[in-house]
Amino acid sequence: MGKENYELYSVELGTGPGGDMAAKMSKKKAGGGGGKKKEKLENMKKEMEMNDHQLSVSELEQKYQTSATKGLKASLAAELLLRDGPNALRPPRGTPEYVKFARQLAGGLQCLMWVAAAICLIAFAIQASEGDLTTDDNLYLALALIAVVVVTGCFGYYQEFKSTNIIASFKNLVPQQATVIRDGDKFQINADQLVVGDLVEMKGGDRVPADIRILSAQGCKVDNSSLTGESEPQTRSPECTHESPLETRNIAFFSTMCLEGTAQGLVVSTGDRTIIGRIASLASGVENEKTPIAIEIEHFVDIIAGLAILFGATFFVVAMCIGYTFLRAMVFFMAIVVAYVPEGLLATVTVCLSLTAKRLASKNCVVKNLEAVETLGSTSVICSDKTGTLTQNRMTVSHLWFDNHIHTADTTEDQSGQTFDQSSETWRALCRVLTLCNRAAFKSGQDAVPVPKRIVIGDASETALLKFSELTLGNAMGYRDRFPKVCEIPFNSTNKFQLSIHTLEDPRDPRHLLVMKGAPERVLERCSSILIKGQELPLDEQWREAFQTAYLSLGGLGERVLGFCQLYLNEKDYPPGYTFDVEAMNFPSSGLCFAGLVSMIDPPRATVPDAVLKCRTAGIRVIMVTGDHPITAKAIAASVGIISEGSETVEDIAARLRMPVDQVNKKDARACVINGMQLKDMDPSELVEALRTHPEMVFARTSPQQKLVIVESCQRLGAIVAVTGDGVNDSPALKKADIGVAMGIAGSDAAKNAADMILLDDNFASIVTGVEQGRLIFDNLKKSIAYTLTKNIPELTPYLIYITVSVPLPLGCITILFIELCTDIFPSVSLAYEKAESDIMHLRPRNPRRDRLVNEPLAAYSYFQIGAIQSFAGFADYFTAMAQEGWFPLLCVGLRPQWEDHHLQDLQDSYGQEWTFGQRLYQQYTCYTVFFISIEMCQIADVLIRKTRRLSAFQQGFFRNRILVIAIVFQVCIGCFLCYCPGMPNIFNFMPIRFQWWLVPMPFGLLIFVYDEIRKLGVRCCPGSWWDQELYY
């Protein structure tokens, strides 16, 4: 097979001259070469320089060999499908499963253990070839080491496999079916079978199945919020209205939603060649950043591996110098490595992260990458999208102006009730107008669904008005039926109003009712009177001024404002059955009566303000990054607390002081709103300076490329950046961030694929839960690692004493593996369940460069203080066991050569008793067991002191963490099983030991506990002192 050539292009959707959206392509990476690569580049450029929106219908037909009435020929469609491939976004090339598994088996510590296993196997093979089979220790040790690496590797791979496949359930981006016309026949096919030149039809409620050039449309509006971040519906029509394909109205984009109306058009781009496909390419061109916890563990593994090799090599040289054979010295080197490397550490870390991920999953946070759990805890900046993340992603009626008063509507997510007076006749008239002058309709069969959650066919504004009407009137659709519609003029950009005429519900009243809604200033200019408390009053200058004040007040809140008016048509001029002609306009469209204003906004989620406040308390900066209008963005930012009360922008200060903006000192403004045009003109250093100067930032009208720039600028300031979002336009920034958080319900597939974490309930507040859990797991991992490292010293010192003082070996390699992977792993993991010592959400985020997972105080305290005490306990028990069997300590010194002599069968102890080699081996295994039990008894004290780093263990409580209590009991039970289970001496070299040998290490365990309580007392009493700096880890 030849090497596959591939090229990757990123797309920048930026703002061009005059505020136009422009597309810019940059080549990111190329593989292969020669003429094919150049040709492919030229083809890509041609696709980027799309001019399909400017071509006439006949030119389109010629270009794509299709018909605007009959569509493609079926035979040609099959050829094009073969040439271009399916109409689907190609997923990024994944890592093969065998490579993922191999990585789990070949990390830094794993490589050391493979080498150690190989040395053991070689030693056993040489022993076997020489006929020396007195012990199979080397074979058992090799098999144990291999089993450790394979089992931990399988566990790690399983966790990664679960994480990477969790996204498989989210496949909502590409529509399942599309209506296509081929050879003049209309039928439905899978959307991925569409090709360029296909003639397709779509209606309200459908997703756009490809990039489509509109040929005909009736009231068609699309929702581009997942692409641009704008909540407002966008009209689609056959006319070319802009040079840029991104701004013109006659192109509908792949994966956007058709809200209402119908449209027919030709497919001009499919799959990866669509606009959304190019943004996905931009995301795939962004390299994943290493997570802080991954960097920490990598750093720690490097240190441990380096020290293990250093100690092993040192002892290897010493062993060679005192007369060991090369093979025995290598086995000794391997023993040092096994003793020094915490084999269970990676499994412990993985289990701790998995437990936290599971805990988060129960709170609707799904973690795709386990390491992202801790990263969220160290987050110092959250760059949040607005639409759908901070807001509900649905337009909602927020304010009404009638009877010369602004009334506030209920914008909560359940919209349980309205707070304004509904008894006014003006209110009834306004409600009638907004209900009748509305083309939106509920999908059938939703009577049992709460009104705010019902699916509506219609654009966002009309959907908001319909739901508002349903909540206030009751049955809005039934209300419409009582006022049959006679004629209608749909909203268009020229008139900027919508008008409809209805017959009245009272059969005795023969009049018609004309109702109109639209841009407030356009509606007002068609009115001559205004409805105040049910009475029509002349629309004089006083009322026009009142209207203007209300209009500016609502517009200043960043809300979309519509005006409403009505007119009863005289039955003499317009009798029942009169034929209204919308073309000739044979009815009045001026002299109307103004009923009021209604403003709408995509309101913030109820839980967001509290979540933002918690972030601020936790020292986390929340920055809004949206594609929406700056005024709307600023209003939402202020309502959720991103811009705090009393904070002003430069523009606000200038307005307050009545001075030019350029004369205001920017450092006086706490808040800042930057739009895409301004951002484009800023160089990186200016952006960094703006982020440093203004604590409260809002970015509006941003492109995907600009979101990337913002994330990179925050990272340049040393921040750990989390990015939240749900749209396709968020995916590049989600991938670039230290942690990307996507929305599970409203989120696009591209966003979910790029993210590290998915919020199943789309609730920004869930991020705060994630931050708290992330901080807690870092604290608990620190405690777990401190506990794990402590026993390395009592495991290492027996070999140090063995080779320097020449005593019989106190501890065997297999025994060490049982400590690492059997008895100690359960208490180590149980620390993941430990509750926080204090309110960790009142602390600043940790600095990844300064607050390391394993720092000098932790290593020094674990190794040289607690570890040293455990070593003394082990040797006290070892020498006690030897003395009680007749081997006094002084006799043990220098005894090693005779002790290990296979041929010496009459070695005398301190009482003159003679010991055969088999008896000595039995005693040596007894010493292994004694030293093992000593370490385990001291580790019980160690795990109790690790419950807290600053508070007293009595303050934290001994029994609050029930898992830890169970783990300690389990640890003791395993120790008893290994000591007293029949057959253990022959398999794993564990021997039954006397009861008093269990008691020898207990005073040392008590010393560890008391010593640590004194340390914690000093840390609490002397904050900032030498004691605190050196002994608080």
Swiss-Prot record:
- Could you tell me what this protein does? The catalytic subunit of the gastric H(+)/K(+) ATPase pump which transports H(+) ions in exchange for K(+) ions across the apical membrane of parietal cells. Uses ATP as an energy source to pump H(+) ions to the gastric lumen while transporting K(+) ion from the lumen into the cell. Remarkably generates a million-fold proton gradient across the gastric parietal cell membrane, acidifying the gastric juice down to pH 1.
Leading EC class: translocase
Q: Where does Mg(2+) bind?
A: 385, 387, 726, 730
Q: Is ATP-binding given among the entry's keywords?
A: yes
Gene Ontology terms, MF aspect: ATP binding; ATP hydrolysis activity; magnesium ion binding; P-type potassium:proton transporter activity; P-type sodium:potassium-exchanging transporter activity; potassium ion binding
PROSITE patterns, from UniProt? ATPASE_E1_E2
Q: What does the record give as EC number?
A: 7.2.2.19
Q: Which residues lie on this side of the membrane: Cytoplasmic?
A: 1-96, 162-297, 348-781, 833-852, 948-961, 1017-1033
Extract the SUPFAM superfamilies matched here: Calcium ATPase, transduction domain A (SSF81653), Calcium ATPase, transmembrane domain M (SSF81665), HAD-like (SSF56784), Metal cation-transporting ATPase, ATP-binding domain N (SSF81660)
Q: Identify the InterPro entries for this entry.
A: ATPase_P-typ_cation-transptr_C (IPR006068), ATPase_P-typ_cation-transptr_N (IPR004014), ATPase_P-typ_cyto_dom_N (IPR023299), ATPase_P-typ_H/K-transp_N (IPR015127), ATPase_P-typ_P_site (IPR018303), ATPase_P-typ_TM_dom_sf (IPR023298), ATPase_P-typ_transduc_dom_A_sf (IPR008250), Cation_transp_ATPase_P-type (IPR050510)
Changing residue 820 to A/D/Q: what effect? Impaired transport activity
Instruction: Give the Lumenal compartment stretches of this protein.
Output: 118-140, 318-329, 802-811, 876-927, 981-995
Q: Which residues carry this modification: Phosphoserine?
A: 26, 461, 599, 838, 952
Q: Which residues are K(+)-binding?
A: 338-339, 341, 343, 795, 820
Q: Which reaction does it catalyse?
A: K(+)(out) + ATP + H2O + H(+)(in) = K(+)(in) + ADP + phosphate + 2 H(+)(out)
Q: Which residues form the active site?
A: 385 (4-aspartylphosphate intermediate)
- Name the NCBIfam families on file: ATPase-IIC_X-K (TIGR01106), ATPase_P-type (TIGR01494)
Protein species of origin = Rattus norvegicus (Rat)
UniProt modified residues of type Phosphotyrosine? 6, 9
Q: What is the lineage of its organism?
A: Eukaryota, Metazoa, Chordata, Craniata, Vertebrata
Q: Does the keyword S-adenosyl-L-methionine apply?
A: no
- This chain's protein is named Potassium-transporting ATPase alpha chain 1
Q: Give me the stretches of Basic residues compositional bias.
A: 25-38
- Location in the cell: Apical cell membrane
In terms of superkingdom, the source organism counts as: Eukaryota
Its keywords, alphabetically, are: ATP-binding, Cell membrane, Hydrogen ion transport, Ion transport, Magnesium, Membrane, Metal-binding, Nucleotide-binding, Phosphoprotein, Potassium, Potassium transport, Translocase, Transmembrane, Transmembrane helix, Transport
One cellular component term from this protein's GO annotations in UniProt: plasma membrane
Q: Give the transmembrane region(s).
A: 97-117, 141-161, 298-317, 330-347, 782-801, 812-832, 853-875, 928-947, 962-980, 996-1016
